[in-house]
Regions:
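Rossmann-like NAD(P)(H) cofactor-binding subdomain of soluble oxidoreductases
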Residues: 55, 61-70, 74-146, 162
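NAD(P)-dependent Rossmann-like dehydrogenase/reductase catalytic/cofactor-binding core
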Residues: 196-197, 225-235, 243-338
């Protein structure tokens, strides 16, 4: 049995705290907001984030970060991506050397263009940072529905240890050494999901969504390969797997925000309506800047940025994607008669 602290009392933090408790571990749950912590202690449920899922009495809900991190074996960082750096900064003085920190947020820091694990390592250099990602909506994990994810770490030993911590009959975990690929897949799929939701909002069909998913993973993989990630990762759980579920699921806040934009909402109105952090909005601009830095063509992500930040109409953005110059789908494959 391990002692585990889950930082963040949103839907994902609650779902993972319950999973880890059911796996037989001692679990602490930390909330940055005293009022949220008080309600969780009293009601043992967060009806706004994860209705119908009860938090066991054995899980202590804390607001004292030092106490939450004292003598723990693993820390699960389940705060939204815009708050990763500030939370990691607060954690730094309480984290012992080589303490395992599992980041489960998905995004890119807009100001620095760093992945979230890079941000955490910058703030907590003594930590041993890993990443858990994949097609895993909290609403389903919290209900115990079968889910499969991937965990990536700097060493095989750490990855396999964490794999054993999270594995259960309803939560299967694979391992990979490709931290960069796992993080890029998790962050950039949110931007593609905004596009897929926008297409739904415009009334387009399954053909359109399939095209966005397929060409979207091609864009993500193209950038990832240029940055040093492994192409194989993008065809796995943290790439195409996460992209499919985020583009198609009713639980996806990124798809929902995109849908509202397709219906005519502004970005600000859509984010307010969703009432949760829409990670794709924060990652979109960073993704475009990274693509420009590495000179990688990413037309879908470019058009998403134009809709979000330049007030381009969603219908016009789709039309511009359709009217791009003719391309070969598989440029690396030779023609027999060439």
């Amino acid at each position: 049995m391990a002692k585990i602290s889950v930082l963040g009392s949103g839907s994902w933090g609650l779902a993972l705290a319950l999973l880890l408790h059911n796996n037989g571990h001692e679990v602490l749950l930390w909330s940055a907001r005293p009022e949220n912590a008080r309600k969780l202690r009293e009601k043992r449920e967060n009806p706004d984030r994860l209705p119908g899922v009860r938090l066991p009495d054995e899980i202590d809900v804390l607001t004292d970060l030092e106490r939450a991190l004292k003598d723990v074996d693993v820390t699960v960082l389940a705060v939204a991506s815009p708050y990763i750096r500030s939370t990691a900064h607060k954690m730094a003085s309480f984290v012992c050397r080589d303490q395992k920190i599992v980041n489960v947020a998905k995004g890119i820091e807009e100001k620095t263009l760093k992945t979230l694990s890079e941000v955490i390592e910058e703030e907590i250099p003594q930590g041993n940072v890993a990443v858990l990602s994949g097609p895993s909506h909290a609403e389903e994990v919290g209900r115990g529905l079968p889910t499969t994810c991937v965990i990536s770490a700097h060493t095989q030993e750490t990855a396999e240890y964490l794999q054993s911590i999270f594995m259960s009959p309803v939560f299967r975990v694979y391992t990979t050494p490709d931290i960069l690929g796992v993080e890029l897949g998790g962050a950039l799929k949110n931007v593609i999901a905004l596009a897929a939701g926008t297409a739904d909002g415009l009334g387009y069909g399954d053909n359109t969504k399939a095209a966005l998913i397929t060409r979207g993973i091609t864009e993500i993989g193209r950038l990832g390969k240029k940055m040093g990630a492994q192409m194989e990762t993008f065809y796995g759980l943290s790439g195409i797997g996460d992209l499919i579920v985020t583009c198609a699921s009713k639980h996806s806040r990124n798809r929902k925000a995109g849908y509202l934009i397709g219906q005519g909402y502004t970005m600000e109105e859509a984010m307010k309506e969703v009432q949760m952090v829409v990670e794709g909005v924060y990652s979109a601009r960073a993704a475009r800047e990274i693509a420009e830095k590495y000179e990688v063509e990413m037309p879908i992500i470019t058009e998403v940025n134009r809709v979000l930040f330049e007030r381009k109409s969603a219908a016009e953005a789709v039309m511009d994607l359709m009217l791009r110059d003719k391309k070969v789908e598989t440029p690396m494959l030779p023609w027999e008669n060439a």
